[in-house]
From Swiss-Prot:
Binding site for a divalent metal cation 2: D203, H272, E305, E399
Annotated function: Cotranslationally removes the N-terminal methionine from nascent proteins. The N-terminal methionine is often cleaved when the second residue in the primary sequence is small and uncharged (Met-Ala-, Cys, Gly, Pro, Ser, Thr, or Val).
Record gene name: MAP2
Family indicated by similarity: Belongs to the peptidase M24A family. Methionine aminopeptidase eukaryotic type 2 subfamily.
HAMAP family noted in UniProt: MetAP_2_euk (MF_03175)
GO terms classed as biological process: proteolysis
Residues that hold substrate according to the record: H172, H280
Its EC number(s): 3.4.11.18
Species of the source: Kluyveromyces lactis (strain ATCC 8585 / CBS 2359 / DSM 70799 / NBRC 1267 / NRRL Y-1140 / WM37) (Yeast)
Biased composition (Basic residues): 38-49
Subcellular compartments: Cytoplasm
Name by which UniProt lists this protein: Methionine aminopeptidase 2
EC main group: hydrolase
Amino acid sequence: MVADTDVKEIVVDALPEVSEPAAVDDSEVTEDATVQDKKKKKKKKKKKGNNMKNIALIYPDEKYPEGQWMEYHQDFNLKRVTDEERRYLERSEEYEQRCNDMRKGAEIHRRVRESVRNKIKPGMTLTEIANLVEDGTRKFTGTDANGDHVDRPKSQGIAFPTGLSLNHCAAHFTPNAGDKTVLKFEDVMKVDFGVHVNGYIIDSAFTIAFDPQYDNLLAAVKDATNTGIKEAGIDVRLTDIGEAIQEVMESYEVEINGETHQVKPCRNLCGHNINPYSIHGGKSVPIVKNGDNTKMEENEHFAIETFGSTGRGYVIQEGECSHYAKKPGSHPTPSLSSAKNLLKVIDENFGTIPFCRRYLDRLGEDKHVYALNTLVRQGIVEDYPPLNDIKGSYTAQFEHTLILHPHKKEIVSRGDDY
């Protein structure tokens, strides 16, 4: 997610004849039934313990499921299906490995969200929910050994902090240590989390609401995101995607507590392209028409995400910061020894992958605040405060990651859930 500072979704066979059963001793039946019951209980326990494990054990051949394939529907892309097909089939091994890494990350993302979605209930703290998501990611990526590292920047693991933004907060909130916020029945919560494999990031998000009065808000945003996915393609102008998203989003209304609201796009929030180890690659995919004639290009990865709001449709940075990322490139060595030591921890565990303060706590850096603020002031680390619409409003988000192959696009993070 990018905040645009400039503007700052029997046929049944006949049963055979059965002969009369032979008489059986009642004690034998009871004994057999008891044995069978014990076996069933044992089987159930065994199955329950194998719900989450390293994804490599589930796919020993290291070939992961492809995402949803979609044709390019724009006329100027139709010729690519024939002209580029042979070139696609002759792609380098490096390209195929990159795609497989993204499919692996996407499969992990699907399995994590499947494992946590039915567990998230009102009454849970946001910290409990964040731990559910992140521990699941660690399990499936195999980065949970000894609990001593959150991530290995050149391997695989958590791609950025788990966003759990409530109601008018649209993005960039995850609980810091000591946060006691409890999820309530009337809340609308955006769940935005990422998985990376060798730096190739899967960025995907969904919204949870328990009260059915928010259904139309969620439907509007899901429809808008799917519209953005449909419009995306090689040589497509970014402003055209934003225009299509805006038209769909604004066609929805939602009634909340007896008051009707038009669903508005959060006009200064955007999707984005994704580069290795860099969640924001430089291109922004608007969710309103903005006149940006920059085009999407072949083989690029994009996170198509949309945010809908019952408020003003504009967010500002507000509240305690939890999200951080080291800026790419070379930087001067911090003069403060604690900042220098913290930077070493960040380099070793995250690189340019975003992190949060809880991750530093987990690494034993529980007295990091002053050193972290020093790195931010010196321009070495970027801070990403929460992004809020007006209080009393509600925001929703849906997001998928896709690859623009020469002949088709692949929505790698697509699942049965959204």
